[in-house]
Each structure stands twice: as C-alpha cells, then as structure tokens.
Amino acid sequence: MLVLRDGESGPEVFMVRRHEDTAFMGGAHVFPGGRVDAADREAAEPRWCDGIADAAAHLAELPSVDAIAYHVAAVRELFEEAGVLLARGEDGHFVSFADAADRARFTQDRRDVYGGGLSLRDIVEREGLRLALDALVPFAHWVTPPVDVRQFDTRFFVTRAPAHQAPVHDDAETTHSVWITAADAIARCRADEIVLPPPTWTTLREIERFLTVDEVLEWTRQRRIVRREPKLVVQAGVKLLLLPGDPLVPERPADPPASETRFAFINGRWRAEAART
C-alpha cells in the first residue's frame, strides 16, 4: 500500500523497514502490506464497506469476493503495520485519532488485530465505521519469479494519508518508518543507505516525476493495470531480474520503461541497471 502525503519537495510516501530477521527481504524498505486472510473475505460485504462495486470492478479478472477481499486486506495490513485505519464514521469523515483516548483505544485494537484476537470487522461494528475501500486506487500487479520456493502474487494500491492519523511502524515485523520522497528513497538506495526490492524501486521511479498527490492519483486512475512478471536469468554467474521493456524480454511493456529495466543481484542486494543486450 502506497500511502502518500504532500510535502515541501513533492509527494512523500510512507515506508517501513522490515525486520533484519525476516526470511524474505529482511532489512529492506518497503510499503506496508501483507497477504489476504480468511477474515478479510468475511468482512467483504456491503454493510461493512464503502466502494464494494468499484473494488470488484478494479480486479474484474477475479471472483468478486476475492477482489473485494484484496481491498479489505490492504486496509487491514495498513492498520496492522502502520496504524492507519481507512474507515469512515457516520458523518462521512475518516476516523480521527486526535483524541488521546481514541488513539489509545485504536492502538490497542491494532495490537489485537495483529495478534489475531480481534478482526477488522469487530472494530467497524463496535465503532459504527465503514471500511473505505473507495479510498484505494489499484496501482500495479506484480508476480515474482519463484526464488527459494517462494513466489508472490501482489497487488499494489495507492491512497492519500487521512488527516488526524499519524502512521508509525509496528516494532515487530518492521523496525523503522519514514516519510520520504521517491527521489530521496532512490538516491539513498543508490548510495547503499537503504535496500529497495525491485518492485518497490520501480514503483518509486514511476511516481517520482509528480509534484502533488493529486497528480499521482489522477495518473494512477487512468493507467491500465497489467500483470508484471519479471524474468529471472543468470548471465556470467550473476542473477538478473528482467522487466518488460528489457531487450532480453520479448513482450512489450504497458507503460514506457524507466531507464532501468533490469536488476542485478550483487553483494547481497538487487541493483538497478540500464537496459543492454
């Protein structure tokens, strides 16, 4: 989930640093997110959610309940990993954590949802809220090549950070968080100050040219979401992850590629490289 806010130097995105001991991409800076749980499907109903029809239409290639569950999962994972709850009250406004008592209550809810003792549906029912699925704009669809028996089929969404909520890492799966512009994140990665997985790098490259959150959202709403399935090859003993648009990948990309269309795994991290034959 890309959570954006307007900053002095352009849109800033909220990123978290994965725990070093995480089996996959430990220590990397990523966007909050996770997987779909059974409870997400249980909450995927009109009485709990706004934007049900649009959510189903966004991912029309899936059964509607699965498409809606993807959106619910994005909301839940954002709450668990960043403490941001995309839900509205009866007045139509996003829930506010400005009041200390409310903030403490929802902070405990966040822990309980993470621990499995509480569901997102429990919270919205208790508080009289509705999950704001209509606040999520589909951004990308990535399917990673199988590596060490792991393969990920991931949907990226983008949203504007709600007022009166301050995201922060969970201090469990993630150990650090930061608001940062796409350009700054890329520069820090180039300087080996942070690690960015290839899909994260590519996403940041796509949004770094925009001056406001409104511009990012408008562009995202108009783009065609296609399945991105990088190819993993080995050249001269080096692992390469090739994106559509690279000379070694036959298919044409839906969007014009960035100058980097491949990533080389060097010294324990993926490094973006310009296309070459």
PLM features: residue spans?
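N-terminal leader/linker segments that precede catalytic domains of diphosphate-processing enzymes
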Residues: 1-277
